[in-house]
Amino acid sequence: MNKAIIFLSFTTSQNQSIQNCIDYFKCSDSKNTDLLIISNAGHIPNGITDSNQLQLTKVTNWQQGFKQIFLRQNSRKLHSFVKSIPEYDEIEICVPHFLNILCSYFVNFCSQKLKSSNIIISLYPDGMLSYQPFEIHSQFQMESIYRWFGGWLSGMRYTLFSGPVADPFSCVKKIYSYIPDITIPYQSEKIIKIKFPKKKLHGNNIFILGHVKQSKFDLDYLKQINKKILLLLSKENYGSIYYKPHPRIANMSHDAFYQSILKIPDINIKLCHDDTPVESLLESIGASIIIAAVSTSMINLKLKYKNQISCYYFGLNDYVHPKYATYYESVFSYLSIKPLRDPYE
């Protein structure tokens, strides 16, 4: 059977999961399968020929936004790419979720132009979305309206929905997952286990990950976190301390968490502004201890490096809606990701 698999992505972390899917396909019987990717993120996975890659522009400023509105560069490139895809017996479209203009537009509209009578929609892992049924309760919430308006202006229509962001249209037939046992199945017919390649870590540094929702923690709470970090530092034999701010925080003066930990006595922090995926960055800096505010990056790090690293989280009940907190606790417990208070209180 002549088959194609089309991956859609918009973050470097998603491209890491796509790479793991590709590695899975290489180990299975996929001789007659062509791999394609449409992405606006860097670090395109290996194993996809240049002619099967479409690199879209990530809109990060007003100038790029105006180009998409008036010239519709991404939309034009996408339509041309879809038109160039030959006929296949089966085409599988792999997305992380549908809370994104590209994924929504491609599945709901571009897929109709693909030359195949058998179109399959699949999910690949993206943080916690494989393990919690995160939902949009109203299709008219403000963020959804912004996406609809942005899609309309750029020529890539976004379909409003309410329901689980991973499968709002009940169209997913296949799910790729690192932990099938606790994966939300939705209406899928098959859950396929993928995995990270085995990697050896060298180093004893500490890696602290920043978060985007700064308002979730007040100054008093951050002071308590500082005490716990200080206690951890007093009990661990470590080299250097690295801090990676969240990509959406451009000005470090707006990073309240970072400004807070700078006040820890005698602490010396090295900043990582690299856009390299956290999983790859960890190897280059040689970190074995990770601290973060329930960052889903810790899930991938634990899956990849297992007992070579220790992960500690804080702020679960403040950062995550109570409805989903139990799902986080389940995954964190499964992977031995511990609250910062344990065993440092």
Task: Give residue ranges: language-model regions.
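Active-site and donor-binding regions of nucleotide-sugar-utilizing enzymes
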Residues: 6-160, 297-298
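Conserved catalytic-core segment of nucleotide-activated headgroup transferases in glycan assembly
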Residues: 206-252
